[in-house]
Curated annotation (Swiss-Prot):
Residues 217-230 have a biased composition (Basic residues). The lineage of its organism: Viruses, Riboviria, Orthornavirae, Negarnaviricota, Polyploviricotina. A motif (Nuclear export signal) lies at residues 137-146. Pfam families: Flu_NS1 (PF00600). This is Non-structural protein 1. Residues 205-230 are annotated as: Disordered. The gene is NS. It comes from Influenza A virus (strain A/Beijing/352/1989 H3N2). Residues 1-73 are annotated as: RNA-binding and homodimerization.
Length: 230
């Protein structure tokens, strides 16, 4: 096992512990809490994959961070902070929409890279809107927290979420997963639209009818998805 992989996990565990204390002291906002919950699932998956205990890893991570802080000068810290771009948090969904439980009459699940796609194949001939909460850096989607598909009545009929055991994903991973979800929903004659925020930050453009400007490769993937009734 690579030592850098282990030390990275240990530091992430300790930093998560610190962020949890911020939440416990009611010093956090909704986006902060969303990321904390997402990262908790990711750490559990990574711990299982690496065969490491999270509590023990947190203790070692604390020692690593304390050593770094002891050696770090205030001036170097200021320069690092000044050169690091800040990410923004985009919220299509409310806290209620983000945390609501939902059920599928005809459930279907597919793993697309580091993302899990779920949809209800019983939904037919509906107008559906895709909404997502995600972070943005340099005006491009950075990290997807959660994407959900809503009918006009507000029912949740589909979802894309990061897999806890696969830390990290790219903007192309997200766009490919959206293409698969759209293909599966459109198979049953549903009309699917994408939020303006997703269009802007994932594809860098806006389509009046709400459809994402998919690449030919993504369109072919959607077609294969439809034929196989994903």
């Amino acid at each position: 096992m690579d030592s850098n992989t282990v030390s990275s996990f240990q530091v992430d565990c300790f930093l998560w512990h610190i962020r949890k204390q911020v939440v416990d002291q009611e010093l956090s906002d909704a986006p902060f809490l969303d990321r904390l919950r997402r990262d908790q699932r990711s750490l559990r998956g990574r711990g299982n994959t690496l065969g490491l205990d999270i509590k023990a890893a947190t203790h070692v991570g604390k020692q690593i961070v304390e050593k770094i802080l002891k050696e770090e000068s205030d001036e170097a810290l200021k320069m690092t902070m000044a050169s690091t771009p800040a990410s923004r948090y985009i919220t299509d969904m409310t806290i209620e929409e983000l945390s609501r439980n939902w059920f599928m009459l005809m459930p279907k699940q597919k793993v697309e890279g580091p993302l899990c796609i779920r949809m209800d194949q019983a939904i037919m001939e509906k107008n559906i809107m895709l909404k997502a909460n995600f972070s943005v850096i340099f005006d491009r989607l950075e990290t997807l927290v959660l994407l959900r598909a809503f009918t006009e009545e507000g029912a949740i009929v589909g979802e894309i979420s990061p897999l806890p055991s696969f830390p990290g994903h790219t903007i192309e991973d997200v766009k490919n997963a959206i293409g698969v979800l759209i293909g599966g929903l459109e198979w049953n004659d549903n009309t699917v639209r994408v939020s303006k925020n997703l269009q802007r930050f994932a594809w860098g453009s806006s389509n009046e009818n709400g459809g994402p400007p998919l690449t030919p490769k993504q369109k072919r993937k959607m077609a294969r998805t439809a034929r196989s009734k994903v």
